[in-house]
Structures are given as C-alpha cells and as structure tokens.
Amino acid sequence: LQGNLVFTDNFGLVNNLPIIGQETLRLKIRTPSVMSGGSFGEEQIIDRLFYINKVQGAKSVNPNVQAVAVDFVSMEGIRNNRIVVDRILTGTYSDIAKQMLKSDLKTKKTVFVEPSSGVKKIIANEVTPIDIINQCKNQAVSKENGQPTYKFFETLTGFHFRSVQSMYATESAQQYIIVENESSVD
C-alpha cells in the first residue's frame, strides 16, 4: 500500500523538527461497516503503520501556516527497494510470487494466491521482488480456468495474486433489483 498525505503545519514543526522522509506514519481510521441489507453495522477500525519515503515540500498557505505533502509506503515497499534478487527461480508463477512475498519481502500479512499452471524458470538478474511478481503476473495462466488475467495487489486483508475470473467468482456484497413501473396506458 502507498499513498500521499497533505497536512497543515501551524507550529513550524517541519522547520523545527525536520521531516526528512524516514519517519513512521501510523494511520488509524474509523469507518462504519455496511451490513447486508444496506444498514450500518459496527465501526471498523483500520490501524496501519507506514513509512514516509518522500517529502514533497511545504507551501505557505498564510504567514503562519504551511501545507506539507508527504508520500508513504508500507514496510514491504521499503524492503522491496532494498532487496535485489539475483538467482534462478523455479516453480509455478504463483509459487514464485508467494516465495517473493514470504521469503524475500518477509511479509507477515496474509497472502492469497490462486494456483497457476506449469512449472517455469525465471533467471532473476538484479531485480526487485515486486518486479519478479509483476513478471509472474503478466505470464501466469490460471490452473483452474486457463485464463491469463492475473492481478497483483494489496488490500487491508493482505496481498493478492489471482486472476480476474476468481474475483468475479466471489459472492456479491449487495444485490440490486430494478423494478419497472407496471402502469399501462389504454
């Protein structure tokens, strides 16, 4: 996960306690969940740690206030930029993707992997784990449905390496019914 954040600095913190791009950012977001039927349920609390990896700079809003923009990334993004893979990888593309996440990026998050077909060999020559996963994503064919439509993404529940068809196969969260007006004109 990655994103950017803009905040106002009323106290000159950016100048007095400089933000240089190596700080930890903790986002704690409270959001109501939607129950089946459309009613609101208990609030969900999203609590995640990120690392600031870029400071866009500060822009003066008025004499005592400046707006500061920072970019942030999850720990796996930081690790990905520091790790170089330089070896031969053998297995299905889904196995290789899982290996990159678990062994190389050392993620503790849940990894959802849809099995792909065929044993492959990748000669990694000084590339990042995410580069290898993206290569696997572009070439993988689903073992279950034979489709080459893999996607790789991260959600709040973990990392996903799966085909578009498997995402379509999940049950709908809501159903929408269109009712036509049955009035007749004589």
Task: State the predicted function of each range.
Residues 1-82:
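Assembly/oligomerization scaffold segments
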Residues 14, 81-90, 118-124:
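Second-shell loop/turn segments in exported
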Residues 28-33, 94-99, 183-186:
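Short, cationic low-complexity segments
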Residues 65-79, 90-110:
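Glycine-rich, acidic and aromatic/proline-enriched surface loops and short helix-turn segments
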Residues 19-23, 85-91, 175-182:
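Short intrinsically disordered coil segments
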Residues 67-69, 74-76, 111-186:
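Short beta-strand-centered interaction patches in the first periplasmic/extracellular domains
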Residues 19-21, 102, 138, 142:
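Short, intrinsically disordered, mixed-charge
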Residues 35-39, 44-45, 107-111, 144-149:
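Short secondary-structure capping/junction motifs at helix and strand boundaries
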